[in-house]
């Protein structure tokens, strides 16, 4: 058996995270989906998933980014989430890091299919 190079788990996760960070298309994304598994953590962070009829995406909004949220999130709500996709190295999982969350259909959006006017807060 020819093993080739052997890497640590940390090295692989770090490499993949670096690949994600170099991909511009993942640095500013807007994703539409239904909220599920929403948890407001005592730290102030919000952990949730976005889902559609075929897939699910793990998401987090950190306490410092909650200025981009002006409503209380609940399971079952349809939203558009703006942020970036990256890898959480410790667990080796990719997720959406939310900066802005807008409910769909409550007057925040003038045109239901056009989200180009949404902008992410600068940090």
Model-inferred region functions:
Residues 116-122:
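Conserved small/polar residues in nucleotide/adenosyl-binding loops
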Residues 9-27:
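Short boundary/loop segments of OB/S1/cold-shock single-stranded nucleic-acid-binding domains
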Residues 39-43, 90:
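Short, conserved beta-turn/loop elements at beta-strand boundaries and strand-helix junctions
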Residues 86-111:
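OB-fold/S1-family single-stranded nucleic acid-binding modules
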Residues 29-35, 76-87:
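OB-fold and OB-like beta-barrel modules that bind single-stranded nucleic acids
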Residues 57-70:
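Beta-strand/loop nucleic-acid-binding surfaces
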Residues 46-59:
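OB-fold (S1/OB) nucleic-acid-binding surfaces
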């Amino acid at each position: 058996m020819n093993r080739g190079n052997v890497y640590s788990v940390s090295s692989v996760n770090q490499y993949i995270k670096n690949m994600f960070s170099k991909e511009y298309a993942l640095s500013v994304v807007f994703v539409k989906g239904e909220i599920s598994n929403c948890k407001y953590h005592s730290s102030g962070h919000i952990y949730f998933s976005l889902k559609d009829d075929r897939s699910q995406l793990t998401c987090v909004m950190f306490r410092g980014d909650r200025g981009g949220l002006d409503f209380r999130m609940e399971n079952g709500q349809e939203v558009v989430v703006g942020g970036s996709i990256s890898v959480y190295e410790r667990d080796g999982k990719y997720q959406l890091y939310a900066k802005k969350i807008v409910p769909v259909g409550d007057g925040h959006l003038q045109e239901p299919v056009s989200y180009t006017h949404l902008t992410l807060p600068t940090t």
